[in-house]
């Protein structure tokens, strides 16, 4: 990608010749491009085809299989045949391309026929425009994905596939579902363009490899079973799960069997001893031995050393959820969950991680008494907290040694000494390896967990055993802030307000025991769990949490996350102060996955059930009277988040909006969860909820009523947000449109899904017409009888208030 964008000649209708040669800077095409890729449709397809074919041919002729990146370093790849090759990041096009363009311009000017000269000038300018677009700073990852999907020319596709190397990893990762879905369901030219990048990244990142393998399996599941076995997606998944893509400098030889394998340690000893930190191959080795011993006919597929522990860890978490679903009562499910996780702790620490986290780490412990089974009628989703130790590099850092639970007290005593009482040598010793005593024990054996009989730990009344779905956040480091000087009177006033309006605790409810734990502040939860952990004294200790779901297809949730993330980025770019909270989704298969819990939040259902107050009275109870700083801040947060989610619900047609699926956090924001019914799907396909979004009279009361300034501010935000979103409609629509390819998801039922989505952006309306539309949607949603009926239906059938 060049340092400066070259401005081409102004775009003219195809029937008119360009006013000058390609280098003319009298006008700029870039202003047109900013309105979306769709504006470029005026370029002659034949000209575009020729230009891109020339680009591809020049790449082949000038560079062959050798390439360098923007910094002059070669990029090592594996091509479609698994053979090492290299590819160039075409940030700066070869000089020969520019020289030929100049020659083309010279040829045009030397022609004798005026009509031929004008036609050649026009074609040359259009070719230059397309190439300059690809080279310009405006050519971002969203535009690249759009051209990769819409273009039918191999030259364009190959060029875009090569340009993927020029974007930041984080930017490409956002579109990973789209890239893999195109690889599975589109033609070979698209797949050939995408594969080198995927293979290259899999060599660099173990977490990227895992996510690719999981998504390839999930998005291939809609194919017929006979087709699926031989599909490109299945073949690429097998390649990723093999050691072929493991970086050469990190490949480890399979360790020899430990003497412990031959000494026949008793199960009790093996249960409480750890393996050598790097001998994780014992997991895959023992698994293979167990499979072949029990069924000699089963083909022995070599699992990759680096992915086997993580895959078994995930499988065991999913198996726990499936077994919990067979139990009749929530109390039995909770006791069984605690028992299962207690056994799982005997296999930790290990070379496993939580894929939803944003930093490298090793899982060392699961505080099992803090786990909770979440509310669900037919299934058993559950939430766990996970203690991890952050590390610089997951692959090269040794797995920490296990610290027995009985060392917690002494560890805490040491921690209370000055400077934590731990020398540098002692800290380093915490990560030392221990002998491998459990090579012959399958590290994540689900069957063994099911067979063992374990005494259930006593349920402590003061422990936060239960917590509602989406009710915690991940621990983050506090940012350093400059000192702020406040008058003593302000300090006294704020302290008195804080003491007078401390958040209230919920009472224990046998039908919803999670409500009590919900009110515990996250930092307090972290402190309490850390004090009870044998690893809590370590400086790199962190607490994470994750929701494990079995029996639910999270592919629609992932699609909704992407749309919310894109809208969030658009509103930030356009400086519209709307607030939404996208939470991470990990799709494990077509019927299982993991969800990142949200910041301290309770559902509106729990608020109303526990407090027996209206939403406004609850705000007053939690944040103080109308004129306090805390209330005004919470009210503004409520308005900004309500407007943001109303637009999300309208654009995506989100259904099933009962009060159990709307959370309220400690700062006053509302957060919508559970996007299982979007676009063309609705609960039981009844299409019962007909309003554009959910806006109840209680919501309006919190805003200050229909005549209040905050209600007018809410409608203004709605208008500004819709105007900003439609400026970038293509970025939102392409996320959905690409995922429709080859999909059997309910949200894509019907042929008009994408057309209806585009219509909801109202591209043909003026801003005055949009303002009238917003007024009509707000008024219709407040008066919607179907919203009231659906809330009543949920109360009668599920007890949701």
UniProtKB/Swiss-Prot annotation:
Residues 278-294 have a biased composition (Low complexity). It comes from the Eukaryota. Residues 29-242 form the PIK helical domain. The modification Phosphothreonine is found at residues 263, 423, 502, 504. Residues 259-268 have a biased composition (Polar residues). It holds the Pfam family PI3_PI4_kinase. Its EC number is 2.7.1.67. GO terms for biological process: inner ear development; phosphatidylinositol phosphate biosynthetic process; phosphatidylinositol-mediated signaling. InterPro entries: Kinase-like_dom_sf, PI3/4_kinase_cat_dom, PI3/4_kinase_cat_sf, PI3/4_kinase_CS, PI3K_accessory_dom, PI4KB-PIK1_PIK, PI_Kinase. One of its GO terms (molecular function) is 1-phosphatidylinositol 4-kinase activity. Keywords: Acetylation, ATP-binding, Endoplasmic reticulum, Golgi apparatus, Kinase, Lipid metabolism, Membrane, Mitochondrion, Mitochondrion outer membrane, Nucleotide-binding, Phosphoprotein, Transferase. The modification N-acetylglycine is found at residue 2. Residues 2-68 are annotated as: Interaction with ACBD3. SMART domains: PI3Kc. The modification Phosphoserine is found at residues 258, 266, 275, 277, 284, 294, 413, 496. Residues 520-786 form the PI3K/PI4K catalytic domain. Inhibited by wortmannin. Increased kinase activity upon interaction with NCS1/FREQ. Its cofactor is Mg(2+); Mn(2+). Residues 1-29, 101-121, 250-304 are annotated as: Disordered. Phosphorylates phosphatidylinositol (PI) in the first committed step in the production of the second messenger inositol-1,4,5,-trisphosphate (PIP). May regulate Golgi disintegration/reorganization during mitosis, possibly via its phosphorylation. Involved in Golgi-to-plasma membrane trafficking. May play an important role in the inner ear development. Belongs to the PI3/PI4-kinase family. Type III PI4K subfamily. Interacts with ARF1 and ARF3 in the Golgi complex, but not with ARF4, ARF5 or ARF6. Interacts with NCS1/FREQ in a calcium-independent manner. Interacts with CALN1/CABP8 and CALN2/CABP7; in a calcium-dependent manner; this interaction competes with NCS1/FREQ binding. Interacts with ACBD3. Interacts with ARMH3, YWHAB, YWHAE, YWHAG, YWHAH, YWHAQ, YWHAZ and SFN. Interacts with GGA2 (via VHS domain); the interaction is important for PI4KB location at the Golgi apparatus membrane. Interacts with ATG9A. This is Phosphatidylinositol 4-kinase beta. It comes from Sorex araneus (Eurasian common shrew).
